[in-house]
Amino acid sequence: MVFTPARPALASIEQSPGTPTAVVVHGSRYVRLGELAPALPTDLTVLLRQWDRYAADVEAIVGSMNTVRRIASNGVSTDYGVFGAPVRDTSTYCAIGNYRGQLMQAALDTSTDTPPDAVRRRVTADLEMRRASGAPFIALTGSARARGTSTPIALDDDALTLDWEAELAVIIGRRAWQLPRERAMSVVAGYSIANDLTLRGAVFRDDVPALGGDWLASKARPGSLPLGPLFVPATRATNPDDLAIQLKLNGEIMQSDRTSDMLFGVVDIISHISQLTPLLPGDVVCTGSPAGFGSHYGRYLRPHDEMEIGIEGLGSQRTRVASARNRSN
């Protein structure tokens, strides 16, 4: 599967700590956005939060063959870029239990006293009912989660059950409040790759087991959402509800599916969230993750693990796990 975008995409690099710079990437090279369009913001987060104002300019740049030629002749190798998240310090919404295969896998893993065929029939019926009359299950997590992909993930001493979740991330470009389904895509700026890192052991609490999942404790730690490196404008992406998605751990495929396995698609998720709270430019919506969590394999992230996520047309994300946060690597 070829994950690389056919056309240029945007990204954010840090030429020095704390100084994000928007760049245009094509293949394995990039140029600074300011070299192509000096009037545009040099910070990709600022640009995305004013997407209505700059969308047409961005479209002209990423759609131009002149951009491709400029990057080919004058671009810098991506090997020399420290990539930050395309957008930072923003609300992050996460769809929970949104892939049919993952829900089936979880049910089979935990229903050891029931024949597998009976489990499959029950789960299939439940999913059909939920799709027909239910709604996406959304968790609002921390605003400091988004992190770049170049810096290793520091593994806290208590993060013994840190799990991976490869996800299609939708980045909002316009304010959305109580949108009908037919208008949902009009507020999408574009797409990126997310790894919705989750402390699996913190999801359910022993002190209040009846209250359900504690998504703040399990998902909200700063830097727990590797995002990017690429941002692909919606006009340059193919159908978000039918993209190949894959995660490798140390070269071994752990997750592999298509976004068509989502129970609720991008339109459903955006419209649903907007009925409950306004979505704002720069907000990140993670759309769920396919089967193949570490909890299924009985194996969580360890120091020096390497993850690679690919989503069709959105590129690849590579991240490495360091050791404890108070150690260098």
How would you label these PLM feature ranges?
Residues V2-A37, P222, P229, A291-N329:
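Charged, cofactor-coupling segments
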Residues T161, P278, Y300-L301:
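Residue-level "contact hotspot" at macromolecular interaction interfaces
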Residues T21-V62:
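N-terminal cap/recognition module
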Residues P229, I253-L279, G294:
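Glycine-rich active-site loops that engage anionic ligands at enzyme catalytic sites
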Residues R147-T149, L279-H296, I309-E312:
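Conserved metal-binding segment of the jelly-roll/cupin
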Residues V2-I13, T45-L249:
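Active-site microenvironments in enzyme catalytic cores
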Residues R88, C94, L280, R302-P303:
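Residue-level recognition of short, solvent-exposed, well-ordered loop/turn junctions
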